[in-house]
């Protein structure tokens, strides 16, 4: 079999080269041909997935983090021709929250799954914003979760722990926001602390944000935290994100829906698959 392998050398702790040295012989020993392309700039993986010639290839692989995977999926969805290849993901980032759902956070195990031809369907969430359409495989966040994502981006030197530390900081800086949320046609106008819509169960580094989520059920799991929740209560809820019991708290509302839209009182940035891309309103 022949594969294209896109490698992001900047992912996580910049261990992609080391991981590549470990996994490439695994493919070669099974007689598979791997064409390795190293990304040179942000958005490069997306361009490659959208524009490369796929003739005679059997799979499109990506070695990187959630941001790299997001780029590959969006590039694949943007192709002008109807060609689609199975996408194989090999973790090389610091979060790799999507691969937690597949129990493939170890790059060797992920490579083995690809070599063994293990495939499965995964939902893709189409997200429409002003002058921009993107596709999500992991999460769409607004409010506090976006604040956390922005802060964590500037704390990459802390590794995976940056998500927890950024969360604690932003909880102390907490502010509520007013918005209209429409879930499967039913509108809710109120104050929110944050809204996060998940395709996957995990976000960040192993947080079970949406414990009922399945990657292929055709539903979006939407978690809403009321704007009136206190900082003390938020801090007490934070540890529960790691076992999924936070959804039983009175300030938390959990929906499973086929679609939703969000219109805040003012336009604000959106967190899509861990990347700060686009602004509200969205649907």
Predicted regions and their residues:
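ATP/nucleoside-binding phosphotransfer catalytic cores, i.e., glycine-rich phosphate-binding loops
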Residues: 183, 189, 214, 224-283
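ATP/NTP phosphate-donor binding region
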Residues: 1-60, 109
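Catalytic core of DAGKc-family lipid kinases
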Residues: 30, 39, 54, 78-193
